[in-house]
Regions:
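Non-heme Fe(II)/2-oxoglutarate
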Residues: 1-76
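Catalytic core of non-heme Fe(II) oxygenases with the double-stranded beta-helix
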Residues: 50-172
Length: 173
């Protein structure tokens, strides 16, 4: 257990998970999409509230609600805990065919609020995921002396409707 994390199966109601997975825009779309291509890999993201269809909008609203954030705080012990209503680093994240992301650290200070980003929630919504594609999230221990990842401790397969919640620090590889 290299850092605090929680794996949650069946995160959403199954029908909501199926329906929201169909709301994603096409990977090649250019409307309200930010494309990342660099040393960590290639992906497309969208965090524009105006672009989200109804169910996606509702789910993000629920995830950012005081009730849900209070529940996360109680479960994780993180206090105070604030939602990121601007979805900086959040929203839809998509990889194309053959896509991958290299091991990296997420930024830990929010660019607008200057608050520490403390928790990260990833929800996998690829209903037809095939384990042969790879794509597992790897959790690594931290080498304190070198400030780099040390040993792979765990892999989390991106199974449909599985969420992983984890501590976002400069040691959470």
């Amino acid at each position: 257990n290299p850092f605090d994390h929680w794996i949650i199966e069946d995160f959403l109601d199954i029908q909501d998970a199926k329906d929201v997975s169909k709301e994603f825009i096409d990977y090649e779309s250019t409307e309200d999409i930010v494309r990342y291509k660099g040393w960590i890999g290639e992906k497309s993201t969208c965090n524009s509230w105006n672009r989200f269809p109804a169910l996606t909008y509702k789910i993000f609203s629920n995830l950012l609600s005081l009730d849900f954030v209070s529940h996360l705080s109680a479960v994780t012990g993180v206090t105070p805990l604030y939602p990121d209503i601007g979805l900086h680093g959040g929203g839809w994240h998509m990889s194309g065919k053959g896509g991958s992301l290299a091991m990296h650290l997420d930024y830990s200070i929010h660019p607008k609020l200057n608050l520490q980003r403390k928790l990260n929630l990833i929800l996998y919504l690829e209903e037809d995921y095939n384990p042969q594609w790879g794509g597992s999230l790897q959790l690594w221990s931290h080498d304190k002396e070198k400030g780099k990842p040390l040993n792979k401790i765990k892999e989390v397969e991106p199974l449909f409707n599985r969420a992983i919640l984890f501590d976002t620090t400069q040691k959470s590889w």
